[in-house]
Amino acid sequence: MKPTIKWNADLYGVEIQTKDQHFVIDANPSMVMTWNDAVRYFEGNAEWKLPTIEQLRLVAQYIGKINMLLRVNGGYEIRGFFWSSEENGKLFAWDVFMGDGEAYSGRKNTFGGYVRTVSVL
């Protein structure tokens, strides 16, 4: 099923809906930080979370359309490596490159990846 991607001004982000998923990706400027810092930064936030690898891959798959929606509505384009919520052992976590949608392993405490949160609807 091709996802429905639409602008949602109330949540100030891009809403993405498929048969299995329904979430909004934050339109605010992305921050660069380590995975450990990202987890601490959003700890306790009930609404906005780090995305899963699957959610980031879906964003990467439709990045052209998503970036166009963000641009015309005052958001910032999504480019580069973005941290997922998923760990890869004790020292590493997964990030996804928006250029190809592939997941790569980065050191949690030293590698600076972009952070963009999602809210599951």
Regions found by a protein language model. Name each.
Residues 1-48, 91-92, 117:
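Extracellular adhesion/carbohydrate-recognition regions
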Residues 111-113:
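N-terminal regions immediately upstream of nucleotidyltransferase
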